[in-house]
């Protein structure tokens, strides 16, 4: 006997898994059918089309020999969203052609109406986890509830879908403004993943100072910072929020500030032809929900690694303006909140913002 489960999986969650796991336990093989329409609102809300969702569901069940994942594009089948008997007949006939072992199919479903619809087109089905007395599923979760408030239902979301639903916070500023301490303190307070400044880690590991840097090093900064971002998102301990200490715009800020400085090994051509295109390419893969920009205001701390020629308030203000312009150039200014208070005030602002995320 072959079990069939189906859904849009926008995202895959425990309610779906209740159905899939029962089918897997009661049949010889379970087919999970990822279905949906092109340009449908639920997929667009999630930011994942049917091909991407199919890949993510496959990733989740990777290594499970009792489950096979296939996709059905309802738009390509010419179906509308009426759930008519004719649509069901077309859809089930197509699904049957996709399953080689299709002589004895049984559908496992989570909605009562599906059992009636499938019966009309000649298929048996088993309703899983539905409470008729209450008129809802026993595990009362839905993809629409998750899309509306992912953090509330975080533990019920399948892992591959979590990075795309994570709230991502970025802290930016010039050197010696308390970014690293702020990010680390917030990370400890909420026990959320954080990223450090890759460029600084790279330079400390290589025993380099700013005048030792070439364009290849700045390129490494851009790629390394992106890797840090991905690692934080994919952290299994990610509880739905991550916070980052700087991103690629800070690398561009320093590179641009060093142009024309005879102590530095970077040219206008390096910046415009190599660094900016690379940063823009990586930027297309990154998103931020909130950006905090710290204004220059503190005493510059010489920790033995910072470039002291840029320690004056005048130079730091110039770098700050470069950063502001980059945020605007990259279309991020609308997400920016400027911080211009004390260390504790900054901490409280971020703490309150994250608390609000979890309380919605």
Where are these regions (language model features)?
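Hydrophobic anchor at the beta1->P-loop junction of P-loop NTPases
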Residues: 171
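Glycine-rich phosphate-binding loop used to anchor ATP phosphates in small-molecule kinases
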Residues: 220-285
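Conserved substrate/cofactor phosphate-moiety recognition/catalytic segment
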Residues: 188-230
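Nucleotidyltransferase catalytic core that binds NTPs
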Residues: 1-166
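A glycine- and Lys/Arg-enriched "phosphate-lid" helix/loop adjacent to the NTP-binding pocket
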Residues: 258-328, 337-341
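Hydrophobic positions on the alpha1 helix immediately C-terminal to the Walker A/P-loop
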Residues: 182
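Conserved glycine(s) of the Walker
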Residues: 178
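The conserved Walker
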Residues: 175
């Amino acid at each position: 006997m072959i079990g069939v489960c189906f859904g849009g999986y926008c995202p895959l969650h425990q309610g779906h898994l209740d159905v899939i796991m029962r089918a897997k336990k009661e049949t010889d093989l379970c087919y999970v059918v990822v279905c949906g329409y092109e340009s449908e609102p639920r997929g667009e809300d999630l930011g994942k089309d049917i091909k991407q969702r199919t890949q993510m569901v496959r990733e989740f069940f990777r290594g499970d020999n009792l489950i096979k994942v296939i996709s059905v594009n309802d738009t390509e089948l010419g179906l509308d969203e009426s759930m008519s008997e004719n649509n069901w007949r077309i859809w089930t006939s197509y699904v049957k052609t996709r399953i080689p072992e299709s002589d004895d199919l049984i559908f496992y479903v989570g909605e009562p109406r599906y059992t009636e619809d499938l019966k009309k087109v000649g298929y048996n089905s088993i309703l899983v986890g539905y409470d008729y007395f209450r008129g809802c599923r026993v595990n009362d979760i839905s993809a629409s509830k998750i899309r509306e408030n992912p953090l509330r239902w975080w533990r019920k979301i399948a892992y591959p879908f979590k990075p795309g639903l994570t709230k991502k916070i970025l802290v930016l500023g010039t050197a010696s403004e308390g970014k690293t301490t702020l990010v680390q303190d917030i990370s400890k307070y909420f026990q959320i993943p954080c990223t450090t400044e890759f460029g600084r880690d790279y330079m400390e590991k290589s025993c380099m100072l700013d005048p030792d840097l070439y364009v290849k090093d700045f390129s490494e900064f851009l790629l390394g910072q992106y890797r840090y971002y991905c690692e934080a998102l994919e952290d299994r301990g990610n509880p739905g929020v991550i916070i980052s200490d700087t991103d690629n715009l800070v690398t561009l800020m320093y590179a641009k500030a060093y142009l024309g400085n005879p102590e530095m090994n970077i040219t206008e051509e390096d910046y415009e032809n190599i660094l900016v295109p690379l940063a823009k390419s990586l930027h297309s893969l990154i998103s931020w929900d909130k950006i905090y920009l710290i204004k220059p205001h503190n005493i510059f701390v010489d920790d033995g690694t910072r470039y002291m020629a840029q320690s004056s308030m005048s130079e730091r203000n110039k770098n700050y303006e470069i950063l502001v312009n980059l945020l605007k150039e990259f279309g991020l200014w609308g997400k920016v909140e400027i911080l211009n208070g004390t260390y504790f005030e900054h901490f409280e602002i971020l703490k309150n913002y994250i608390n609000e995320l979890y309380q919605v």
